[in-house]
Amino acid sequence: ANTLNVGESGLAARLFTPIAALGGEAMRIEGEGTLRHRPMAMMVEPLRTLGVEVRDGGGRLPIEVHGPIKGGRVVVDGSISSQFITGLLIALPCAKSDTTIEVRDAVSTPYIDMTLETLERFGVEAMHNEGDYSEFYIEGNQEFTAIDYTIESDWSAAAFIMVAAAIAGEVTVRNISTLSHQADTSVCRALERAGAAIIIEQGATSVSHRPLEAFTFDATHSPDLFPALVA
């Protein structure tokens, strides 16, 4: 089998495994470090249901997939991460058959919105009822259209700098938009609750220190903010 080593990236593992299953050859997905101990079992049965041969290491990497992925009806556990759902939404438009994905307990739903918006930009459609992430319908045999695309700045990375400024300084982060679908834009709301000063302008957000206080924040849909906010 060919090998794809994703390093320590959980996103790459969950995103590229269903994409790798589009081909007709076996592909072994490997990882390094702590990624080898992170849960991947949520991918195994859905991929098998979609016609992929899967050999897994007890719900952990490495995982070997042998496609092609065929489509059909599949149930996916969305309670751990939306990353695998994103991988399916990217891969399944290229399957030979139509697919219905039933998602149970979806988290990080803003990232699903980002995926759907990006697919649309590339000429691919995955249908669902707005605000409802429990079911998606994807026609097979779609084709991606090549376009020029500008990748947004990363709010997950910016959050650490903004939190540092709230604790002991001042910073202006440019070329980021609070209108983004990225879930981590909510770091601004969290810092405001903590008492930091936030100024939002077009294309830039400024954060400066003020006396901070305890606050409550639900990170269900923005888990990447948790390490920064606990500071």
Residue ranges and their predicted role:
Residues 1-231:
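Short, structured segments at the rim of ligand-binding sites
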